[in-house]
Amino acid sequence: IVTAKYWHQAEDGGLHFTVAETGWAKASWGKIYGQWLIGSAVMVYDFDNFDPKQLTSVINHYGVTSFCAPPTVYRYLVRKGIPDMPTLKHASTAGEMLAPEVFHRFKEQTGLWLCEGYGQTETTLLMANFKGDHAVEGSMGTPSPFYHIELRGKNGKTVENGEVGEVVIIPEKAGRQPGVFTAYLDDEEQYRYVWRDGVYHTGDAAYMDENGRYWFHGRFDDIIKTGGFRVGPYEVENVLMEHPAVVECSVIGVPDPLRGQAIKAVIVLDTSYEPSLELELEIKNFCNQKLAEYKWIRFVEFVTKMPKTISGKIQKHVLRSQNESL
């Protein structure tokens, strides 16, 4: 109900469409049941290949009123031009970081606020920019009333506002929390690891501002450790997305004998640009002028497409595995 009514803002008599494989956990709590319970019909459309252009045709053909999709879909739309979607009243996104540029351009072209949310396969919706609260670009929003959430440091203690910590869930009852998974199939060791010290460890890093809003810093697996600093990839990616040549990007850490890890940008170019050394230097300079020196991009790779999940989420672990011996 929280997801459907207060994040997706699905309506009684409306038609909701979430881009999520129907075999996923999110399909049950973020695509079907909550929307039904508040009286909305549900658009179920599974596809073999990710095609954002096709999604807008579906929205208009069937008269979708509320829509949720990964940022990849919205990035494509603002780059290629958003067609008129007169029935669409509410738009939301989750799955990876949404660049501020995409947030603002979508608002300019449609008049709709993109409401970000955050959750995991192991949970339901944990945080979001909820109905009645002004959506803020880049923010995970505020916690769902269903959960007690804290940010904790390596010492297990709650961090101060503005400090990065791990998102953890404090269960209502000892060792149990409604809405959180109860086991990993055939992996009891991993289950005990994430449910340690009496709390559930998400593995996600974030910080909270003075207004109680949370901001994603990165998966701990994705955070780049370079020259003694810890860099969240999304800050660098947001700057990259401001360059007109960049359609998609993913920032990863690659082995570096001097720094431990160096920052590498994997980039899909707009069709009006061609890969070249000159363009690589231009993009590096464009970004590095806006970033602290320890966040500078050291390597660039141009690719024609990114490895993605069926819903369009970029798979950073695949990119990292391809660059282990760089």
Model region roles, listed by residue range:
Residues 146, 157-193, 231:
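Conserved ATP/PPi-binding loop(s) of AMP-dependent carboxylate-activating enzymes
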Residues 1-65, 80:
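Conserved AMP-binding/adenylation subdomain of ANL enzymes
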Residues 138-143, 194-198:
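Short Gly/Pro-enriched turn/cap motifs at secondary-structure boundaries
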Residues 11, 37, 64-69, 78-136, ...:
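Gly/Ser/Thr-rich phosphate-binding loop
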Residues 21, 95, 119, 141, ...:
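Active-site glycine-centered loops adjacent to acidic/histidine catalytic or metal-binding residues
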Residues 85-88, 246, 297:
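Core-facing hydrophobic residues within beta-strands of well-ordered domains
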Residues 67, 177, 190, 205-295, ...:
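AMP-binding/adenylate-forming catalytic core of the ANL superfamily
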Residues 150-171, 207-211, 274-280, 315:
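Conserved beta-loop-beta connector loops within the AMP-binding
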